[in-house]
A protein has these predicted regions:
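Acidic, low-complexity intrinsically disordered regions
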Residues: 1-284
Length: 284
């Protein structure tokens, strides 16, 4: 399970869910920078989208390894942010010309330390914070999208879709039980290679809790209710990812690990994304 090589014949899919509600106007320390939660969400999403495009580049051009969808929820509704139809193939995405900006980013260096490094960043999506938080409605839409994708004959043997939800964890259209139920439905969808992976990234303004990535159960004891609920909504990371997660967390890390992170630095958030969105086998 979770071993299928990602190729142009056996493609995979990524869904990035972005909380764009009014609560994202709050400011948060993101690594060494202060910004709004909406800016942190957009920054993280833009970094992931650019990485997905870069991973598909070969000497003969961008290979069509996966479909990508970005689902925004806020302003009292759900919207597709890359393409109105939902999915966009990565080669079509690469042909777009997003706005560029320069930003100083906390980057993990080879010696394990973090340093501020200036990067040029593509802006595929822009920060937005307005209205309520229809996370349940967004999960319903994503459930149907990934189910339809997995049902297609050409995708049935593929590495399963990966859903990454970036939020401050406060839905307005459901209670905790209902959110847990719809997330369970999303995780229950599968290809022959495994179930959909649902990762939650909790953007929090708290500066009193330690940052945690791929938490174990005992690391969630001091977390707030929203973080604990998001952890229960997340996938338990498969054994195929255990070694990479152990290397990230260090000595004392023992599975099972929840597919989430909270109160994390920029470098840690990107580590979550990198591990969660990397097949354990090479792309060919």
């Amino acid at each position: 399970m979770y071993a299928q090589e990602i190729t142009r014949r056996h493609r995979t899919a990524f869904v990035i869910m972005l909380d764009r509600s009014a609560s994202m106007q709050g400011r948060v320390r993101f690594g060494r920078m202060m910004m709004t939660k909406a800016e942190a969400v957009a920054f993280t999403a833009n970094a992931l989208i650019s990485e997905l495009v870069d991973r598909s580049r070969r000497t003969d051009g961008v290979r069509n390894y996966y479909d990508v969808a970005v689902v925004g929820y806020g302003n009292d509704g759900v919207a597709m942010l890359l393409d109105e139809a939902g999915w966009l193939s990565v080669d079509a995405l690469a042909r777009r010309e997003p706005r560029m900006s320069r930003i100083s980013v906390e980057t993990l260096m080879p010696d394990g330390t973090a340093a501020m490094v200036e990067h040029s960043r593509a802006r595929w999506v822009e920060p937005h914070a307005e209205g309520t938080t229809p996370m349940y409605e967004a999960m319903l839409r994503v459930r149907d999208m990934v189910a339809e994708w997995c049902d297609k004959m050409e995708n049935r043997e593929s590495f399963p879709p990966i859903v990454i939800n970036i939020t401050d964890g406060e839905p307005s259209d459901c209670n905790d039980r209902e959110l847990l139920d719809i997330c369970s439905q999303v995780r229950g969808i599968s290809t022959q290679d495994g179930n959909v992976l649902l990762l939650n990234i909790h953007i929090t303004a708290s500066d009193t809790l330690p940052s945690v990535v791929f938490p174990m159960a005992d690391e969630l004891i001091s977390a707030g209710r929203s973080a604990r609920v998001l952890a229960e909504c997340s996938s338990i990371m498969p054994d195929a990812f255990a070694e990479a997660i152990h290397d990230l967390k260090g000595a004392g890390a023992v599975p099972p690990y929840y597919g989430m992170g909270y109160n994390a630095t920029v470098a840690e958030l990107l580590s979550i994304i990198n591990i969660g969105s990397r097949s354990i086998t090479r792309m060919a």
